Amino acid sequence: MQKNTFSSANFADTKPHYELLDGLRGVAAILVLFYHIFEGFSFAEVTNGAGDGIIRTLNHGHIAVDFFFILSGFVISYAYDDRWNKMNTWQFFKRRLIRLHPMLIMGAIIGCLAFASVGFERWDGTTAPTGWVMTALLLTMFMIPAVPSVPYEVRGNGEMFPLNGPGWSLFFEYIGNISYALFMRRMSTRILTTFTILLGIAHAWFFIGNVSGYDMIGVGWTIDEVNFWGGLVRMLFPFSMGMLLARTFKPRKIKGVFWICSIALVVLFSIPYIASSGSISLNSLYEFVCIAFLFPMLVWLGACGTASGTTGKMNRVLGELSYPLYIVHYPIMYIFYAWLIKNNIYTLDNCLGVAALVIVSSIALAFLCLKLYDEPVRRWLTRKFMKKQQ
């Protein structure tokens, strides 16, 4: 890819990047979209007391977030490690804010509009006061999380960002970026290796030991004590692995990687829920193996791969859509979930057309946000606030 080509993966940077990793990020974002469709059936079951709430299709789709964290560590380390003699910490923060925050704001606005479309009705049937919804909107725009049970946690489900739930991962992504700029980038490869191993041990203890009680690596979405520390470890371990991979990476040209890795992600996310009989969470153990061993392998393969022609164009489109799709699809899911609950629908067979509409609408909305808002706004912010660097 040419150095002056616009890319959603690394906006305003002049260093070439890995197109296949962009594409895999897009594949993972689409799988998150499908995962949340099936999560809706589980949520409706639990809300209506009609089932056990286990997600039975794409059961492990939530660990796409952990795949994103590895990609983030890899891309940031690759893009910035050798630039600190030309760039200071504030310039780095500006770059990352320009990259991430415009769509975060748009996601909050869309989330507010989606909530308004159902009359600000909470999951328990009560109505959230308009003033507190506006407070939640403002706080989300400034990335200030809601603590469970405070008035501006307006949906009553304990989410950090009740207008747009996936904002929790951006909260930890920001922490990862700040950690990188302040101290992680200064670590030697040996120290980073030790740091990553220690984080891996903490990660295994927390999740395989089922400290959260979730029997899965699904923490971080709320700000209670278990979820905050669990979410922090959940982000830092794969993020540091991504950094370590970028520093030690030795490329080899491998053909067909995009399709191999895409199929692998589908298969890994589709493994059925693994029930546990003792104190060890076998479900979390499987997800830990994915995060600690299999995802880094996929990132390495993606960085080794080459794409041209139709596959290359597909990777560019997927990469550009990945972040907008991730950050704007969930407000539509809230409406979908409310519809499932009210109509007692718990399987895809009973709502195939509506589910297809949700998927198409989410992708279309992401594309419109990308082209009409995200790209123009980031270009303007870059011209306004970033000095051209060599």
Language-model segments: which ranges?
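Alpha-helical transmembrane segments in multi-pass integral membrane proteins
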Residues: Q2-L20, I30, F34-N59, Y78-W90, ...
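Alpha-helical transmembrane segments and their helix-entry boundary regions
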Residues: L21, Q91-F92, L100, S169, ...
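Active-site His/Glu-centered metal-binding helix of metallohydrolases
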Residues: V27, F38, F68, F171-I175, ...
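Helical transmembrane-bundle signal
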Residues: V32, F69, V75, A108, ...
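Membrane-interface helix-loop-helix regions
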Residues: G53-H60, L100-Y174, A202-E225, V289-A303
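Loop-to-transmembrane-helix entry motif
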Residues: R96, L100-L104, L321-V328
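Hydrophobic, aromatic-rich transmembrane alpha-helices
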Residues: G176-L198, M241
